[in-house]
Amino acid sequence: MAKEIKTIGVLTSGGDAPGMNPAIRAVVRTAINKGLKVKGIQKGYNGLINDEIIDMDKKSVSDIIQRGGTVLYTARCLEFMTEEGQKKAAEVCKKHGIDGMVVIGGDGSFRGAQKLADAGVNTIGLPGTIDLDIACTDYTIGFDTAVNTAMQAIDKIRDTSTSHERCSIIEVMGRNAGYIALWCGIANGAEDILLPERYNGDEQAIINHIIDGRKKGKKHHLIINAEGIGHSTGMARRIEAATGIETRATILGYMQRGGSPTCKDRMYASIMGSYAVDLLVAGKSNRLVAYKNGKFVDYDIDEALAMTKDISEYEFNISSMPVSYTHLRAHETRSNL
């Protein structure tokens, strides 16, 4: 017999992502419509351990769907990964009668969700990260907004770069996953895209590409560099010294996490939030909501965390950039040894 859920909690954990508020709103409204009570856990797993719990109703999520960030606040919590921290969290859940939990975050957040499920709290995860780096899903809450924010900023930088006939290096977020860099590189028409999954450190190839472009009459050269490669300022100095072309680095930073979520992030996050409540009501636990091959589905969290994900060769190749393509082939050669 499925466990009857009467009170659910919702928390956001790890890095914030635009669309978390629409997801929270959907969780609260769907749960209340099904006759459930909802508790909001502030500051992620820190708040769960420290009993920072609030009652939530439809009024508490009014006027938040268009807001960036998370009204529940978020944090990373090392204590929760300890046995003592998990014990405290379980006691807080018991105190408030929380028998179901929706966790919005990334891989680390889902490992925490597994611990809650082990403690007897039915738990459902929603993929909330701007990095698009969760292997089981083609969509993560916040990516669409983040990549559009970055694209618009790069368009503006490109305007001034062309006016001054500069080379510009734009560093975007993505420590281990280069999806923002890849998508912006294609959407902004960059000459080079440097991805953690692909780049082999060959700056000379980039320099040669810049010089070749200038000989052909190009008035600018745009390089999109993922955070995982970094060192954009030093790279700019070296490129300018080698080419004699004025080169500037811009690090977009945390602006990519902020801002009003796009229509897609509002819509998909809302569907995922509602889906999570449906799973809890059905007695499901330790599941991760995903969007795969055009459908909203759910996976066992253990299975989802064991999956791997890599940059699509097709998406990478349609950019038609010789330097970037060289990096791709080098990566594939190394992988096949």
Role assignments for model-derived ranges:
Residues 48-103, 109, 141-148, 152:
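Glycine-rich oxoanion-binding loops at beta->alpha junctions
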Residues 23-27, 108-121, 181:
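Short Gly/Thr/Asp-enriched flexible loops that form oxyanion-binding sites at enzyme active sites
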Residues 103-105, 115, 143-246, 250:
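Accessory alpha-helical/coil subdomains and C-terminal extensions
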Residues 246, 252-324:
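C-terminal active-site/capping subdomain that shapes the small-molecule cofactor and substrate pocket
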Residues 117-140, 194-198, 251:
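Short, acidic/small-residue loops that bind anionic groups at enzyme active sites
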